[in-house]
């Protein structure tokens, strides 16, 4: 390879790893709370990591994140209170109706088993299955975000090993087009209507913007 080609490959690897980190952080923030994630959003460490990753993979969104998202991600409540806020927002329907973080609640309601089978197929194509010890379904937002975290990391790995990344790029495009880009706008609308906790409102806002921008970039990369 010449120097210019080397630089282009390094840039693609860096972008893929940064995308992977963003998906991981979104899944952490929108998953069931744990002490470690609460600490990371309380001391600001995870917001810094998110901003650094966005600066690498999506500079235009990094500015929006700094101005509109990050200020709402700073947690000042206890872990117990944060856990209660999550349950109110997404689980208990008490004292107000909760928003749903399941794709099958928002689309294909009449054929959720078919949706689950399709998602299982996506995951199994890459050797992945849901944790048998857990009780999450394949259509949870966190499962889908973690799948994108996996695909973007595998793209970077392929590039580092001088292998073709096309299979991982196509999988990202297909999964975004068929799933996250379709239903995240519906989640955002429901969260805006039902959820008062700005931490979750902000993260869903960021997630929708990020998947839209990522799909646009995938289409460009595959057509280049």
UniProtKB/Swiss-Prot annotation:
Its main location: cytoplasm. The keyword Chaperone applies. GO terms for cellular component: cytoplasm. It is found in: Cytoplasm. InterPro entries: DMSO/NO3_reduct_chaperone, DMSO_Rdtase_II_chaperone, TorD-like_sf, TorD/DmsD_chaperones. Gene3D superfamilies: TorD-like. The keyword rRNA processing does not apply. Keywords: Chaperone, Cytoplasm. NCBIfam families: DMSO_red_II_cha (TIGR03482). Belongs to the type II DMSO reductase enzyme chaperone family. May function as a system-specific molybdenum chaperone protein essential for the assembly of the perchlorate reductase PcrAB complex prior to its periplasmic translocation via the Tat pathway. This is Perchlorate reductase assembly chaperone protein. The lineage of its organism: Bacteria, Pseudomonadati, Pseudomonadota, Betaproteobacteria, Rhodocyclales. The gene is pcrD.
